[in-house]
Amino acid sequence: MKPVIALVGRPNVGKSTLFNRMTRSRDAIVANLPGLTRDRKYGEGELEGKHYIVVDTGGITGEEQGIDAAMAGQSFTAMNEADVVLFVVDAQAGVTPADEMIAKELRVRGKPTILVVNKIDGMQPEVAAADFFAMGFQEYMYTAAAHNRGVRSLLEKALEPFPEQEPLEGEDDSGIRIGIIGRPNVGKSTLVNRLLGEDRVVVFDQPGTTRDSVYIPYERLGERYTLIDTAGVRRRKNVSEAVEKFSIVKTLQAIKDAHVVVLVLDAREGIVDQDLHLLGFAIEAGRALVLAINKWDGMSQDDKDEVRREIDRRMGFVEYAQIHFISALHGTGVGHLYESVHECFDSAMAKWSTNQLTTLLEDAVSQHQPPMVNGRRIKLRYAHQGGSNPPLIIVHGNQTDALPNSYKRYLENTFRKVLKVVGTPIRFEFRSGENPFAGKKNKLSPRQQKKKERLMKHVKKLKHKQKRKKSR
């Protein structure tokens, strides 16, 4: 599991700046979900092969009321999810009552904590931090996040207890890994148990923190699968509980580890912003995708038609996804999910030869030529595969950086159709060969210079004669 680092502190101590520094090593996946998680941002980062998740919490002052109190509660939830807490304080402001309140809360919870004395710009670190030592934290670091000072050392310190993550077992050992994601109470728990089989006693108690996703290996019709369940640690008797614990950390982990992601939606509630945020995580990761529209039974035909129209309108940008209308409670349509999972897996993990891809590229170019740039045609010469899950196709040519998005979409649609890729995105990377003469002027020899001068004189004489003829 990736270690989870929570940034905790009162407002305006530099948590967001530190968050941006810690996640800049790769594109941060940031979520601001309405309601439940709009006050927490989640990002991913990497340091020397160690991957981690960062949680940027809302500020805590100890005097919150209303929605601010809810935000403070989310910060404490982040502490529970975290493997290590970075308690950020402002060196220039000194110790405040809010700092002391947070320190007390952290001591009660007993989480591994590093005191981060931020904003030490132009100050003696030891002098600036002297007041904070009374809080009793053994681990402390000095940073100036705005200037990126001390951030790397802080990360090294925070990640020190965690070994490098070993890759998951291969396909032969664990089979197809299916990640089940969705917002609370859309029926993930019911679907998980339906997929595993009614007669199976499912006990998902597993050591670890409450944010651990549960990996459940099982067999069906001789095929091996591993179900990555994010619905929470629970026993079968509690599956009917109305309130279901939800964690973006689990969702990110499940998407990252899965071959195929099943996003569960509630047909009766329709598509909400939180569904689209979760969908965005799956798209960002490039995972094969199956949409399971749950609670489809008992709906009127008009309501069903409205749901279909809403899916077309709000999720049209992910047209490659396989869509199933199911009832996890009664089992309707659940068996067909496996068919799509297999199709998606085969497409996501497919291997194609360079010869096959280059021939396909040549056919696509011959049917629809790339546009001209500065009077020269963009050339696409050959293609080869660069990776799987999602499939990555690397196209080599010249001036590829000028290739318009419309032509890239044409290539994606053509490759998808001919290669029969379903359920997974195809990513393209375009590379141009370097021009050795770019930026260089051709220096003429003395003989070439004289020839050029003669030609220029000749051209001038011709122009002069033509001018005289016109004047007559």
UniProtKB/Swiss-Prot annotation:
Q: Residue spans with biased composition (Basic residues)?
A: 440-472
Span of the secretion signal?
none
Residues annotated as binding GTP 2: 182-189, 229-233, 294-297
What is any one GO biological process for this UniProt entry? Answer: ribosome biogenesis
Molecular function terms, GO-annotated: GTP binding; ribosome binding
- Kindly indicate whether the keyword Nucleotide-binding belongs to this entry: yes
Any idea which positions bind GTP 1?
Answer: 9-16, 56-60, 118-121
Q: Where is the KH-like domain?
A: 350-434
The residue ranges of the EngA-type G domain are 3-166, 176-349
Q: Which InterPro entries does this chain map to?
A: G_ENGA (IPR031166), GTP-bd (IPR006073), GTPase_Der (IPR016484), KH_dom-like (IPR032859), KH_dom-like_a/b (IPR015946), P-loop_NTPase (IPR027417), Small_GTP-bd (IPR005225)
Repeat recorded as keyword: yes
Q: What keyword terms does UniProt attach to this protein?
A: GTP-binding, Nucleotide-binding, Repeat, Ribosome biogenesis
- Which intervals of the chain are annotated as region Disordered? 433-472
Subunit description: Associates with the 50S ribosomal subunit.
Q: Which family does it belong to?
A: Belongs to the TRAFAC class TrmE-Era-EngA-EngB-Septin-like GTPase superfamily. EngA (Der) GTPase family.
Q: What NCBIfam families does its record include?
A: GTPase_EngA (TIGR03594), small_GTP (TIGR00231)
Functional summary from the UniProt entry: GTPase that plays an essential role in the late steps of ribosome biogenesis.
What name does the UniProt record give this protein?
GTPase Der
- In which organism is this protein found? Hahella chejuensis (strain KCTC 2396)
